[in-house]
Amino acid sequence: MRRALALAALIALSTAATAGAAYAEHWTKFANGDNGTEWSYDGDYSYKDKQTGRLVVMQAISKPSANLAPGGPGTGVGYVYALDCAKHNVIMVSAYKPSQPFAIPDNWRSNTPKKAGGAEDEALFAAVCPHIDHVPVK
């Protein structure tokens, strides 16, 4: 019970600390996971990488039955992926969770892409790839 209270307090403090940040998060659910989890992507973070043409997307896991909403670095748990919508492959750019600092490695573009597979990957591609021409290029 004390752990649950400590976790709730940590989440509340993290949320309060980032509430004034200029970065807005707009999460859109794209898939159901195992054991009542859900996967969402942040539409405000998505962009097309100028160097590779890949669609870069932040996704987070949530569990509504435990009152855990999707969140970005510092408050949530998730990944940043670079998708090649035409070739249907993906590069994991970074992973994040509250207990570690968020960092995007400079060399992520040189990582070997992996073929997309599984229901969650397919759902992510279906949800975000139609918007590739409507996101900012960075």
Each model region followed by its residue ranges:
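Bacterial N-terminal signal peptides that target proteins for export
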Residues: M1-A8
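Alpha-helix boundary/capping residues
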Residues: I11-A12, I132
